[in-house]
Curated annotation (Swiss-Prot):
It comes from the Eukaryota. GO terms for biological process: mRNA processing; RNA splicing; tRNA processing. The lineage of its organism: Eukaryota, Viridiplantae, Streptophyta, Embryophyta, Tracheophyta. PANTHER family: MATURASE K (PTHR34811:SF1). It comes from Juncus effusus (Soft rush). InterPro entries: Domain_X, Maturase_MatK, Maturase_MatK_N. The gene is matK. Belongs to the intron maturase 2 family. MatK subfamily. This is Maturase K.
Length: 517
């Protein structure tokens, strides 16, 4: 990567040339236009090429491009037909493998200028290593903010592009490499059929799949374009005076809120998350869902809805269905976001004040987002994963019955601990113990099914070891966050809001009901 840093510095960030001419030269055109190769591969060492990913290197990508073309050329010359070998049934496996490797390699190369920009941004900023922040992740800072005098909120589903050409046009704003744009169109048209994936109603499920780096890059470019223009226009409004907002993308360091703004593109992460807050508006987005709340009236929120619909229509040239933006009163509305059931909670604080001989009671009230464990949605997810029935009755997991006893205990215990860690900051966690009970009994039924015994027998046989896999001491977990161990009673731990989960890695069970909320 360092070898090409000097090349990138010659251009402005938004006007740089892509790296494909340096790496692949005429093979891009040969592949896109089905022309013959008249020259041989030029030779260079692996160290001279960009290869910061062990699995997908540019050398392998270039070799696969040549091999795919040669295979296509031989078939066309022998059969004298116009069919493309990429969609030929006899070569489906190789076509899928080649296309996957090439798309992953291209995605890595595309991320290089953005990664360099992010690294330079990180070096210029001082990282605050605070050890006792109440929340250690960005999304939870949003959940703990005091929403004073906020009345209405909009639940927004960001529309997916109806045609892949919209994504290509967005890339044209900052990429001037015509060969790259032709190659992307080639992938869309000839093999991957990305248009079907993009226009699918379950487009968010693509994020759950592996090896979709190129699509994530295209989709993140599309969302970044929307948010860049949205933020630029919103700063011109008298209702949106920004006071504090920030971007949180790190998973290791603890960050405090900052009072300046810098757009950072990071597409190597599978999920990009950021938010900003000010005294007039709250906005947070995760994947394709955004929450917009404001102090303004209901009429102002309707104006924002009309603005967003027109914005997508005239800027991205496709229709934004108005029913994808729901406007509700905060006090009478609960909504799913980031795997939580959120509602507005009123907190009363009564303070006794003494003025001369008179005693006065001062009742103050503030609004706070109440994070509730979505028990019904989690049980539905467990039912889909065959851990329980739709009513929450634990059942065995037959597909795991062939594993060793230790592996079965480890898998069930890992799922239980991950869910407990993720929802540890919820204000009410009683439902979480029900989920743990379902997983624990499902594990016992799976072991009993494997050894053709009863659940009671295995519960007595395993004893403490079985409980150890499912119940982690809270003091041990909290000691990882705080410098000293804090002792909590069971009643207090049910109300304490302590977060210690890596927000970038979301449990698959959480994503399931996010798609259906």
């Amino acid at each position: 990567m360092e070898n090409f840093q000097g090349y990138l510095e010659k251009y402005e960030f938004c006007q740089h040339q892509c790296l494909y001419p340096l790496l692949f030269q005429e093979y891009i055109y040969a592949l896109a236009y089905d022309y013959d190769l008249n020259t041989c591969l030029f030779s260079e060492s692996v160290d001279e090429l960009i290869s910061y990913d062990n699995k997908y290197s540019s050398v392998l990508v270039k070799r696969l491009i040549t091999r795919m073309y040669q295979q296509n050329y031989l078939i066309n010359s022998v059969n004298h037909s116009k069919f493309n070998s990429f969609i030929a049934n006899n070569h489906f496996f190789y076509s899928h493998f080649y296309s996957q490797m090439i798309s992953e390699g291209f995605g890595i190369i595309l991320e290089i200028p953005f990664s360099l920009e992010f690294l330079s941004f990180s070096k210029r900023k001082k990282r605050l290593k605070l050890q006792n922040l109440r929340s250690i992740h960005s999304i939870f800072s949003f959940l703990e903010d005091k929403l004073l005098x906020f009345h209405x909120m909009s639940d927004i589903l960001i529309p997916y592009p109806i045609h892949f050409e919209i994504l290509i046009q967005i890339l044209q704003y900052w990429i001037q490499d015509i060969s790259f744009l032709h190659l992307v169109r080639f992938f869309f048209f000839e093999y991957l059929n990305w248009n079907t994936l993009i226009t699918s109603k379950n487009w968010v499920s693509i994020f759950l799949k592996e090896n979709q780096r190129l699509f994530r890059f295209l989709y993140n470019s599309y969302v970044s374009e929307y948010e860049f223009v949205f933020l630029f226009l919103s700063t011109k409004s008298s209702y949106l005076r920004f006071t504090s907002f920030g971007i949180f993308l790190e998973r290791i360091y603890f960050y405090g809120k900052i009072k300046h703004f810098r757009i950072v593109y990071v597409t190597s992460l599978q999920r990009t998350l950021w938010f900003f807050t000010d005294s007039f508006i709250h906005y947070v987005r995760y994947q394709g869902k955004a929450i917009l709340s404001s102090r303004g009236t209901f009429l102002l929120m309707k104006k924002w809805k009309s603005y967003l619909v027109c914005f997508w229509q005239y800027y991205f040239h496709f229709w934004f269905q108005p029913n994808r933006i729901l406007i509700n009163q905060f006090f009478n509305y609960s909504f799913y976001f980031f795997g939580y059931l959120l509602s507005l909670k009123k907190n009363h604080l009564v303070v006794r004040g003494q003025i001369l001989e008179n005693s006065v009671l001062i009742d103050t009230m503030n609004n706070q987002l109440d994070t509730i464990v979505p028990v019904i949605x989690l049980i539905r997810s467990l039912s889909i994963a065959t851990f329980x029935t739709x009513s929450g009755h634990p059942i065995s997991k037959p597909i795991w019955a062939d594993l060793s006893d230790r592996d079965i205990l480890t898998r069930f215990g890992r799922i239980s601990r991950n869910l407990f860690h993720y929802y540890s900051g919820s204000s009410k966690k009683w439902g979480l113990y029900r989920i743990k009970f379902i997983l624990r009994l499902s594990c016992a039924r799976t072991l009993a099914r494997k050894h053709k015994s009863t659940v009671r027998t295995f519960m007595q046989k395993l004893g403490g070891m079985f409980l150890e896999e499912f119940f982690t001491e809270e003091e041990q977990v909290l000691s990882l966050v705080f410098q000293k161990i804090i002792h909590f009673s069971l009643h207090r731990s049910n109300r304490e809001r302590i977060w210690y989960l890596d927000i970038i890695r979301i449990n698959d069970l959480v994503n399931y009901f996010e798609l259906r909320s």
